[in-house]
Regions:
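Long, acidic/serine-threonine-rich intrinsically disordered regions with weak helical/coil propensity
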Residues: 2-94
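Generic helix N-cap/helix-start motif at coil->alpha-helix transitions
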Residues: 94-101, 126-135, 147-148, 160-168, ...
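Residue-level signature for tetratricopeptide repeat
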Residues: 106-107, 136-141, 172-173, 509-510
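Solenoid-repeat scaffolds in large eukaryotic assemblies
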Residues: 114-117, 147-151, 181-185, 370, ...
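TPR/TPR-like (Sel1-like) alpha-helical repeat modules
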Residues: 158-163, 174-197, 203-231, 441, ...
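Extended alpha-helical solenoid scaffold regions that build the rod-like backbones
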Residues: 230-421, 425
Length: 532
């Protein structure tokens, strides 16, 4: 009996219950019972589990649709991360649970952070709607020939119902040498009539009931993988229209033809290699080794400026590259590199020459670049790693002064209160000092945290903090999630350093009202201090 109960816990491709020695199958689980879904603890960022409860779903949907269509800056994306992935009650006004969860799932998929997806599934094991995430996760790792990584997810999630994922789980059980469990799940699905002929045939071959056959399917990555594993002497020639997941699988399974064996007289094969390189399936270095195998006469190499125009685009690239390797003059090198780059771009292959181009430019001293190639050089060279600048305190300017230590959690509230009033005393004596908006932002943030400003310093500046009524209403109603979306929308594609100080003031004022001090402090320390 204990053994049966253990099996019921393990085999969850379908919901299985055992009563009176009869197996019952429930294949219709609803998302409507889900009340909570998320990844981060609300308290981590000073939020509440009710952060979405009072918001109108129409506002949420329109704002999220706008945000997900943009290429957000790092900080804007961080706010969206916190808003969407914090564990919270699901809103229920003018938005269904499925709609809201789909925004979370689509966002995680767009980020392509598979560790984050795994963590989300671990913390939300009963989300049947999470099958979209599970499929994305399993397909990614299988297309990269990492079957064990694909299979591990089935030990985490409690509920799957789709035929595809159930088939995937059965195959994983076979792969893990848990054939009895695979057979039980197979028998259950057979009773339901949910198994297709292709999978049944491959299952029987893998279980040893039938001999291997030559049946191949490109329907999905699982079926293509099963084809590979059950066909003797498996060979597959990809075509231009071959799906990318198959290209990835072939590359990571060492099933692609080595570039040195590609027939350079075969135009389609060359173009396939170029497309695969652009899609990061082939290495750029392999493509350029292929270009080296082309044969050109001395006149073509000497008169490349005219000769390459008479060739097919891929042949022209081979000629330009070979001529580049014979060139030592920097202006001529840059001319050849720019012609190569232009040729790749015109053939819609912008990613096939980015790493190689950056590497070649790295070997050219920047001070020897002619002025007419400066833009080309700066745009395509390898980005320099910027050294992280340190904050330098300057007590002559309030927003650059030692009070910034408080926002780095280096000083206590009583200490910063004393330091603030001491600095304001000096500023009051200095008749030439004019309070800037940056100074005001710091003082208002300190006041928001409870710093008491002495009455004699309270009129050093005029400041009216009038937030729009729409935002004010959201704050009063506890619609923190929606307010965070609005902040992310305001920042959009801009880096914090590029925001106007009025925008910084507006955002910091909202965060002060919400008491979201960590996010506020990050903005202040990015925008205000003097850095060296």
């Amino acid at each position: 009996q204990n053994k049966n109960e253990d099996s019921n816990d393990v085999i969850q491709g379908i919901k299985i219950e055992q009563q009176n020695e009869k197996i019952l199958v429930n294949n219709s689980l609803s998302v409507s019972d889900i009340k909570l879904a998320g990844l981060y603890d609300p308290e981590e960022n000073g939020l509440s589990i009710d952060m979405w409860s009072n918001s109108n779903g129409e506002d949420i949907k329109s704002t999220l649709k706008n945000l997900t269509s943009k290429d957000l800056s790092k900080f804007s994306e961080k706010i969206l991360d916190i808003a969407l992935l914090t564990n919270s009650y699901i809103p229920n006004t003018n938005i269904s649970s499925k709609e809201f969860l789909d925004f979370k799932f689509d966002y995680l998929i767009k980020k392509e952070n598979f560790d984050l997806i795994k963590e989300f599934l671990i913390k939300n094991p009963n989300l049947i709607e999470g099958e979209k995430l599970i499929k994305f996760y399993t397909d990614h790792y299988l297309s990269n020939s990492q079957l064990d990584k694909s299979c591990e997810i089935f030990e985490i999630t409690n509920l799957i119902s789709s035929d595809y994922l159930t088939n995937f789980k059965m195959y994983c059980l076979i792969h893990q040498d848990r054939r009895d469990e695979a057979q039980l799940l197979f028998d259950l699905k057979t009773e339901l009539g949910d198994l297709d002929k292709f999978f049944v045939n491959k299952f029987n071959i893998l279980m040893g009931y039938k001999k291997s056959n030559e049946e191949l399917s490109e329907k999905n990555i699982l079926y293509f993988h099963l084809s590979h594993k059950t066909i003797k002497n498996f060979e597959y020639e990809p075509k231009i229209e071959t799906p990318k997941f198959i290209w990835n699988y072939l590359a990571t399974s060492n099933l692609l033809k080595n570039a040195e064996f590609v027939d350079i007289e075969n135009e389609e094969q060359i173009k396939l290699i170029e497309i695969a390189t652009n899609d990061e399936v082939y290495k750029e270095e392999d493509l350029f080794k292929l270009y080296m195998r082309f044969q050109f006469d001395i006149n073509q190499l000497l008169n490349y400026r005219n000769a390459y125009k008479l060739l097919e685009d891929y042949e022209a690239r081979a000629l330009l590259y070979q001529r580049l390797l014979l060139t030592s003059e920097i202006p001529k090198k840059l001319n050849l590199l720019s012609l190569l780059k232009k040729s790749f771009d015109q053939s819609n292959l912008p990613n096939a020459f980015d790493e190689k181009l950056a590497s070649l430019l790295k070997n050219i001293p920047e001070d020897e670049i002619p002025s007419n190639y400066t833009t080309f050089f700066m745009k395509n060279k390898e980005p320099e790693k910027l050294a992280e600048l340190k904050i330098k305190l300057n007590n002559k300017v309030f927003h650059q002064s030692k009070v910034l230590n408080y926002f780095q959690n280096k000083t206590s509230l009583p200490q910063v209160e004393k330091e603030t009033n001491d600095l304001l005393k000096k500023i009051k004596k200095n008749k030439k000092y004019v309070f800037s908006l940056k100074d005001i932002i710091v003082v208002e943030s300190l006041k928001s945290d409870g710093v008491q400003i002495l009455r004699k310093y309270q009129k050093l500046y005029d400041y009216n903090n009038n937030l729009p009524s729409e935002i004010n209403t959201m704050i009063v109603n506890g619609e923190t999630g929606l307010v965070l979306l609005k902040i992310s929308e305001i920042i959009g594609e801009d880096n914090l350093e590029d925001l106007g100080i009025e925008s910084v003031d507006y955002i910091v004022s909202i965060l002060n009202e919400l008491k979201l001090v960590d996010l506020r402090n990050e903005i202040l320390l990015k925008v205000l201090p003097l850095k060296v």
